[in-house]
């Protein structure tokens, strides 16, 4: 295999030299000059002419919709919504994260790993994504499964590239300078959103230009919004709390009287036996003994004999087991009943962003340099991102089209002292850091072969390093850590709550928050494009060498010496060979079919190999790379002048099937590989959460449709996606509440490590609009549809042929993930917008989002699977008890209250001058 790979790479390199000779030989056979009239196609229409599963969205910075909604309007693309992450996390065909989706900004892979602190009842969650301000995004291109160039490096399902605004986006026509102003505000907790960008450009004598652009953006995002129907998200579940409180008071011997006051429940014997007229021949002797019984007799004397109201009886209100004390007791324990999905105050976001670019361009070369910053404060946590990038292109002839790119990205998350993660308090300031460096160089050649065959080749090399580190090892965020500052009193030592243990019994170090380590990718890639008339063949191939070095905790227990838990490192390397081939034909404007086959790989991440709930229990560097084989069949339609002279129709229909081997997911089960350590055996620590390769092949199939029609006066956009999959879940997709869990549940805490990523069964968007008064006035209506989707439950599903047996003397080995349940299809959501352009490039836009004020749930929102959607109920009725005796006296319940925004009015202004 190694010899074959080496031979392929050498052969691909020689094609460049051979092609030059062929081209020179054909030069003298040129018969005459051929005049070619190129079609001028706008960026948003180009995907309808390209033989690939690609979609584009332009002018994102002008949008009043969120960046999540923009991405979700693309068929086959979605986002993992997380109100606390501060990043844009793109999902392609149910795959998400570093290596599954190559998310880029201006062609630079984004590696930031965001981990949020706890929000209300929910534990923090983690996800990869791009830390970018949507106000700076000119457009986004999404490629699904097929690839070319550097975008195919470590990209299992595809890539998404966010393009930022440049000099020529800001300056109109040949003017020397330009300014863009954007402002947005609205109702329903829509906070301020402002951006300004200024650019200057000077034309040079050689026909080139030099320019500079600077932009500033500030945004605030509040989650304290009202859902459909007008109720605030944070207040959801008050009805459940009220019922549980009533049940709590009933158990304590109180009921509500007609005036809404708590009063003694005279049907309870401890009250009825102390009435002034109690029946002395009844079974009351036990209930009339002691000081508490005496107090009850005094209370009932005032209530029944003297006719006082309950609120005026001091002993009833302030007694040891009176109403005030019962109320305080409920308040201390009400967390177990709360189902509010988030605590809005902990997710208030305030961001400030800067963009500075320098550009030079002429007929033969282009040079660009940029600095981009983002500072985002989410609750008490801060995110800081700094991105530096240089691009250079030199194009002298058909043999020399050289591109060079270098980038340096730094991302930091600052956790304050006193913050909570998984219910555990951060003891001191904690800073996690991500540093990525990328260098990419490639050269393209264009040849004219015999038989009027055009050949274009690109040969490139990419070097990419990515490192995760922390300013200190957070020992307090460990499963068995024993420290007075984390002691929860009796709660710690009972069967409920946090584990703790001495060093002589249990390891004190875990790696659950931001595992540290370094990745290196070295990739050689080669693209070829053959064209003859209406037929085209594209083939892209790359070879990647991947090396890693990660940090984990050791455990040394030597007789006669103190137990040592050193920080150790483990390294390794893996290889992958990826290729993508597309055959297409331009049979007519109405029918341009294409067929694509691609084989792609994804390397295991540091977070998967070195996450460990305790000591080195979860470390698994033997993970195999994921491998996907995808077949796509589709066609394009691009027709100008269909019904009128200038109308344009674009259609793209794609069907696909994917087969993924060695799918990586986290599993709860047996963890040791070289024999069970003594500390684990003596404490019964047989199971933990670790990452594994899924044994069955993951299969996906689906259809994606995109239609665009524009005739000036009328326009329509349609997108629709359908998918079937047997994609497995993770064990960490849903976890018990970190601050209200039993010790058994704490062992199964997933720390927000993963979330369900399967796409809804189907989803789509339809937009219809019309333009009037020389296209100055635009009216539009958009309808969003989400079909049946999934969320993880707290219940276990056993895999690899294993099963769990209760009450056995010796537990068998088993492996578990989380079951899912369906989220029913959501109501159709309508958004109405009106925009007016009184003068050129001044656009005033008014929008009503969720026009009909529907109550709906956004699929793939982290809050859907949050622990706060599960609570303990004591309200089981007699039917439940009759069916299952274990349900008597209370049981776990689940709800889905993580609703999206209700009706919201938006007003925005965009001015370019």
Swiss-Prot record:
Subcellular location: Cell outer membrane
Residue ranges occupied by any TBDR beta-barrel domain in the UniProt entry: 176-913
InterPro entries found in the cross-reference section: Plug_dom, Plug_dom_sf, TonB-dep_rcpt-like, TonB-dep_rcpt_b-brl, TonB_rcpt_b-brl_sf
Topology versus the membrane: Multi-pass membrane protein
Cross-referenced Gene3D superfamilies: TonB-dependent receptor, beta-barrel domain (2.40.170.20), TonB-dependent receptor, plug domain (2.170.130.10)
Domain TBDR plug: start-end pairs: 42-165
Gene Ontology MF terms: siderophore uptake transmembrane transporter activity
Signal sequence range: 1-27
Motif TonB C-terminal box per UniProt: ranges: 896-913
GO cellular component: cell outer membrane
Name of a matching Pfam family: Plug
GO aspect biological process, one term: siderophore transmembrane transport
Protein family: Belongs to the TonB-dependent receptor family.
Functional description taken from the UniProt entry: Probable receptor, TonB-dependent.
UniProt protein name: Probable TonB-dependent receptor HI_1217
Organism: Haemophilus influenzae (strain ATCC 51907 / DSM 11121 / KW20 / Rd)
């Amino acid at each position: 295999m190694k010899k074959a790979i080496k031979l392929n790479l050498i052969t691909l390199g020689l094609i460049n030299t051979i092609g030059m000779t062929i081209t020179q030989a054909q030069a003298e056979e040129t018969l005459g000059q051929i005049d070619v009239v190129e079609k001028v196609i706008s960026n948003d229409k180009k995907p309808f002419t390209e033989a690939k599963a690609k979609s584009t969205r332009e002018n994102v910075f002008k949008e009043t919709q969120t960046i999540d909604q923009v991405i979700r309007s693309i068929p086959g693309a979605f986002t993992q919504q997380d109100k606390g992450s501060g990043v844009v996390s793109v999902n392609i065909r149910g795959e998400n994260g570093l290596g599954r989706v190559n998310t880029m900004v201006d062609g630079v892979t984004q590696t930031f790993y965001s981990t949020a602190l706890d929000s209300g009842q929910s534990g923090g969650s983690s996800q990869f994504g791009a830390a970018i301000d949507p106000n700076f995004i000119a457009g986004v291109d999404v490629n699904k499964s097929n690839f070319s160039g550097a975008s195919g490096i470590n990209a299992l399902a595809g890539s998404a590239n966010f393009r930022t605004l440049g000099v020529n986006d800001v300056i109109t026509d040949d003017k020397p300078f330009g300014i863009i102003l954007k402002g947005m505000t609205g109702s329903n907790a829509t906070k301020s959103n402002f951006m300004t960008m200024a650019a200057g450009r000077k034309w040079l004598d050689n026909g080139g230009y030099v320019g500079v652009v600077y932009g500033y953006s500030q945004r605030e995002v509040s989650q304290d919004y009202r859902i459909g129907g007008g109720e605030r998200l944070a207040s959801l579940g008050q009805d459940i709390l009220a019922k549980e409180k009533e049940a709590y008071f009933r158990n304590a011997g109180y009921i509500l009287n007609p005036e809404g006051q708590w009063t003694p429940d005279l049907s309870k014997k401890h009250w009825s036996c102390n009435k002034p007229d109690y029946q002395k021949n009844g079974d009351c002797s036990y209930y009339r003994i002691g000081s508490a019984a005496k107090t009850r007799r005094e209370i009932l004397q005032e209530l029944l004999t003297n006719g006082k109201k309950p609120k005026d009886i001091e002993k009833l209100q302030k007694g040891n087991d009176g109403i005030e004390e019962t109320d305080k007791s409920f308040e201390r324990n009400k967390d177990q009943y709360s189902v509010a999905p988030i605590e809005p105050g902990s997710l208030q976001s305030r961001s400030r962003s800067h963009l500075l670019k320098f550009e030079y361009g002429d007929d033969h070369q282009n040079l660009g340099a940029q600095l981009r910053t983002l500072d985002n404060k989410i609750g008490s946590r801060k995110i800081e991102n700094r991105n530096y990038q240089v691009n250079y292109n030199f194009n002298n002839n058909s043999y020399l089209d050289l591109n060079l790119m270098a980038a340096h990205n730094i991302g930091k998350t600052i956790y304050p002292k006193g913050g909570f993660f998984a219910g555990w308090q951060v003891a001191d300031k904690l800073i996690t850091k991500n540093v990525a460096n990328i260098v990419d160089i490639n050269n393209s050649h264009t040849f004219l072969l015999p038989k009027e065959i055009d050949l274009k080749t690109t040969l490139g090399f990419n070097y990419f390093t990515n490192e995760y580190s922390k300013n200190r090892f957070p020992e307090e965020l460990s499963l068995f850590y024993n420290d007075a500052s984390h002691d929860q009193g009796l709660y710690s030592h009972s069967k409920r709550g946090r584990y703790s243990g001495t060093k002589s019994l249990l390891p004190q170090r875990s790696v659950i928050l931001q595992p540290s380590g370094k990745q290196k990718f070295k990739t050689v890639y080669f693209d070829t494009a053959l064209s003859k008339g209406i037929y085209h063949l594209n083939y892209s191939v790359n070879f990647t060498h991947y090396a890693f070095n990660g940090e984990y905790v050791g455990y040394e227990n030597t007789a006669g010496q103190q137990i040592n838990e050193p920080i150790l490192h483990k390294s390794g390397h893996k290889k992958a060979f990826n290729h993508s081939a597309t055959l297409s034909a331009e049979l007519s404007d109405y029918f341009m079919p294409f067929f694509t086959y691609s084989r792609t790989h994804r390397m295991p991440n540091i977070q998967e190999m070195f996450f460990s709930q305790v000591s080195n229990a979860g470390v698994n560097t033997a993970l195999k790379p994921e491998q996907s084989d995808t077949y796509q069949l589709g066609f394009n339609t691009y027709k100008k002048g269909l019904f009128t002279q200038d109308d344009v129709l674009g259609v793209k229909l794609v069907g696909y099937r994917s087969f993924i081997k060695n799918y990586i997911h986290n599993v709860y089960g047996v963890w040791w590989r070289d024999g069970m350590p003594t500390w684990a055996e003596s404490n019964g620590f047989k199971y933990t959460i670790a990452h594994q390769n899924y044994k069955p092949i993951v299969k996906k199939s689906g259809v994606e449709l995109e239609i665009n029609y524009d005739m000036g006066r009328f326009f329509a956009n349609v997108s629709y996606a359908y998918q079937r999959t047997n994609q497995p879940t993770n064990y960490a997709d849903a976890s018990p509440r970190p601050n209200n869990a039993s010790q058994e549940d704490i062992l199964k805490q997933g720390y927000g490590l993963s979330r369900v990523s399967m796409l809804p069964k189907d989803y789509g968007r339809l937009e219809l609009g019309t333009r009037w008064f020389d296209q100055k006035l635009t009216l539009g209506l958009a309808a969003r549809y989400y079909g049946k989707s999934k969320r993880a439950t707290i219940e276990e599903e056993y895999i690899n042929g294993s099963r769990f047996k209760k009450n056995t003397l010796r537990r068998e080995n088993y492996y578990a993930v989380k079951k899912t349940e369906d989220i029913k299809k959501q109501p159709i959501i309508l958004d109405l917008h009106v925009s007016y352009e009184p003068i050129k490039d001044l656009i005033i836009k008014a929008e009503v989002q969720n026009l009909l004020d529907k109550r709906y749930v956004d699929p793939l929102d982290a809050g859907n699977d949050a622990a706060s959607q599960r609570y303990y109920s004591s309200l089981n009725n007699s039917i439940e008890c009759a069916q299952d005796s274990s349900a008597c006296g209370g049981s776990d319940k689940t709800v889905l209250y993580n609703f999206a925004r209700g009706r919201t009015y938006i007003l925005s202004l965009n001015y370019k001058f």
